[in-house]
UniProtKB/Swiss-Prot annotation:
Alphabetical list of Pfam families matching this protein: TruB_C_2, TruB_N
InterPro entries, sorted: PsdUridine_synth_cat_dom_sf, PsdUridine_synth_N, tRNA_psdUridine_synth_TruB, TruB_C
GO molecular function, one term: RNA binding
Record-stated family: Belongs to the pseudouridine synthase TruB family. Type 1 subfamily.
Taxonomic lineage from the root: Bacteria, Pseudomonadati, Chlamydiota, Chlamydiia, Chlamydiales
EC numbers, comma separated: 5.4.99.25
Active site as annotated: D45 (nucleophile)
Swiss-Prot/TrEMBL GO biological process terms: mRNA pseudouridine synthesis; tRNA pseudouridine synthesis
UniProt entry keywords in alphabetical sequence: Isomerase, tRNA processing
Function: Responsible for synthesis of pseudouridine from uracil-55 in the psi GC loop of transfer RNAs.
Catalytic activity from the UniProt record: uridine(55) in tRNA = pseudouridine(55) in tRNA
Protein name in UniProt: tRNA pseudouridine synthase B
NCBIfam families registered for this protein in UniProt: TruB
PANTHER family: PSEUDOURIDYLATE SYNTHASE TRUB1 (PTHR13767:SF2), TRNA-PSEUDOURIDINE SYNTHASE (PTHR13767)
Amino acid sequence: MELATESIEGVLLVDKPQGRTSFSLIRSLVRLIGVKKIGHAGTLDPFATGVMVMLIGRKFTRLSDIMLFEDKEYAAVAHLGTTTDTYDCDGKIVGRSKKVPTMDEVLTCTSYFQGEIQQVPPMFSAKKVQGKKLYEYARQGLSIERRFATVTVNLRLVKYEYPRLHFVVQCSKGTYIRSIAHELGNMLGCGAYLEELRRLRSGSFSIDQCIDGNLLDEPEFNVSPYLRDANGLILQPAPVL
């Protein structure tokens, strides 16, 4: 375990493993470095992987609100023909369809997700309505009226092999990728849920800058060489040999 000193501060870019919660990674980092002042620039669902921006120390946790507003980029897979109550692979199956959309239909529907669109947050989300998170209502079997939100997206179809539709999307803050998968399913008339999600970029930070999140569970792992400033520059560059 590293000694908790004022020098342990900065931005740590982590590739979140599948199956881990975002907060379990934060807890692992707290245990590893002994610094409790740790924030983030956006969480990921347990089934998702990819860029998690961890902010260590008061100087950097103050940047959280700014970084949360930055655009993000995701690679995703929508599973057609099945719908779930959460719009993703962790939910309960609530519908099935035998319809197999054509490529022309897929191209037409995916072209809708360009520029500003109106999106309704899913019931199984942390969005608050009347001071209560939507998923708390959902777990009680309640469906609450939600307001449309305007978000900006740029979706690119990568591959379509039924039942899987692969796409990459750049989006603004507050965009729900599983809602995009759900809406695609509705537009195609077959239903869909989000099967895979990988965050490729958060603001200016990309996946190729990240360390494996499992390293945070290694007691002797030294995070210092991987700490960056707010612009992504390494704070302690490796010495030139």
